[in-house]
C-alpha cells in the first residue's frame, strides 16, 4: 500500500487514508471509557501541563489505545510525533484520527522495512523555529528502535564503523543504509539530537533487554525508565493481555478450532503464561518449552507438559513463540512440522522464527492466503501457515490487547514521561523502574471501573506490618 503523505506548515503525516478519521474517532471515544487510569491522569494534569512544549517522539503500535495515550500526552502539554514500532500493527483508522487532529503521525499497516525506518526517522525529526532539524527531548519506545537509531547515529558521528560491517539481516542492512544517508544529508544531526535528549521510557521486554545491554557496555546516553517491569505492566499487559489477544489473532487469521489441538508455547515468562492460559481456555492441549528451570517448574505445576520443540515435531498443530530470543523455531523445525501446522510469534521481533531462512529455501512455494497469512509448501508436499510474517500475531492478525489492560501500561508510560522531565537534572544515565507507590496508584485508578472495593488497614494493623496505612504495601523485592 502506498501511504498518503501530507506536509503543510502546521503538520505532516504519512498514513493510509485520512478519510478513516471519523471511524477512528468513534472507536477512540469507546476506548477512553475503557481506560480509566489514563483518563484520570489526563484530567489530573490537564491544567498544570507538566510536559508543556516538551518534544516527544513515540515509537509504539499505532492502535486505538495508543491514540488515547497520544492525546493524553498532548493534553498535558507535549509536542508529539509518532510512528508505529511494527510494520503490521497499525490500525489505519487510529492513525487517521490522530493525523486529523494535527499530530504528525507516520504509520500504516503493511509497511516495508525501508518505509518503517523512514517513518521512525520522520517521527524523531523536529524542526526548530529557525529551521534547524533536531530531535525529541523525550522518547516513548517499544522495542527500542528509536533508542537504537539515535545511539547508532551518534556513534557513527563519533567514529564508529558499524555501518560498514556486513549486515546480519535484511533489517540491519536497512538501518545501516538509513544511517549512511542521514550522515550525508544531515551532517552533525545526531549530536544535536543527543544534546537535547533527556530520557526514554521503554514499553516492552525486548526493548528493556536492549537498554540493559547498552548500559552494561557503558554507552547509554540518557536516563531510561523500564516501564515493562512495573507490576501493573508486566503482570497485566504481558499476561492478561496476551491471554485474550493471542486467541483473537489465531482465530481471525485461521478460523481455527483450538479445542483438541496440540499447541506448543515456546517460553513461560509472563507472555508465555498468558499465551498458554489462552490456548488452554479454548481446550487446546498445551506443551511448554523452557530453558529456565524455575519457569519450567511453574509450567509443570500448572499442569502443562514441558518438553523440547524437537519432541513435538510431527504431532503439534500450533506453535507460538514468546521468548524475546532469536532462532527459537529454526528452518529445520519448520520443515519437520506436521502438515498444515500454524506458526506464529507473540514476542516483539520476527527473529524468534527463522523467517529469512525459510524464504531463502529452494523449491519452497509461498502462497499468500490473505493479509498476514502465508502458506509455505515444502517439496515433500507438507505445508505450514506462517502468521504476520513472524511478527506479532495479536497485532498483525487482530487488534492487540484490550483497552482496559493497555490503560495500565500507558498510565505507567505517562507517569514515566512526567517523571523523566521533572527530574531531568537529577536522573543519571542508568535504567530505572518506577517507584512502588506509583505502581500501586496505577492499579488503584482501575479498581472502580470493575467494581472493586479495597479493605483499609487500621493503624494498628499497618504498624504490625510496618507499612503506611495508605501504602505502599509491598517491598520492592516482592514478587507478585
Curated annotation (Swiss-Prot):
Subcellular localization, as worded in the UniProt entry: Cytoplasm
UniProt-listed PROSITE patterns: ADOHCYASE_1 (PS00738), ADOHCYASE_2 (PS00739)
UniProt remark on cofactor binding: Binds 1 NAD(+) per subunit.
Gene Ontology CC: cytosol
Pathway: Amino-acid biosynthesis; L-homocysteine biosynthesis; L-homocysteine from S-adenosyl-L-homocysteine: step 1/1
Annotated NAD(+) binding sites: 204-206, 238, 267-272, 290, 325, 346-348, 394
GO molecular function, one term: adenosylhomocysteinase activity
Family annotation (InterPro entries): Adenosylhomocyst_ase-like_sf, Adenosylhomocysteinase-like, Ado_hCys_hydrolase_NAD-bd, NAD(P)-bd_dom_sf, S-Ado-L-homoCys_hydrolase_CS
Cofactor: NAD(+)
Position of the signal peptide: none
Record Gene3D superfamilies: Adenosylhomocysteinase-like, NAD(P)-binding Rossmann-like Domain
Binding site for substrate: 63, 142, 203, 233, 237
Protein's GO biological process: L-homocysteine biosynthetic process; one-carbon metabolic process; S-adenosylmethionine cycle
Superkingdom in the source lineage: Bacteria
Reactions the enzyme catalyzes: S-adenosyl-L-homocysteine + H2O = L-homocysteine + adenosine
Record EC number: 3.13.2.1
Keyword vocabulary terms for this entry: Cytoplasm, Hydrolase, NAD, One-carbon metabolism
SUPFAM superfamilies named among the record's database cross-references: Formate/glycerate dehydrogenase catalytic domain-like (SSF52283), NAD(P)-binding Rossmann-fold domains (SSF51735)
PANTHER family: ADENOSYLHOMOCYSTEINASE
Assigned protein family: Belongs to the adenosylhomocysteinase family.
Described purpose of this protein according to its UniProt entry: May play a key role in the regulation of the intracellular concentration of adenosylhomocysteine.
Protein name according to UniProt: Adenosylhomocysteinase
Natural source organism: Xanthomonas euvesicatoria pv. vesicatoria (strain 85-10)
Highest classification ranks of the organism: Bacteria, Pseudomonadati, Pseudomonadota, Gammaproteobacteria, Lysobacterales
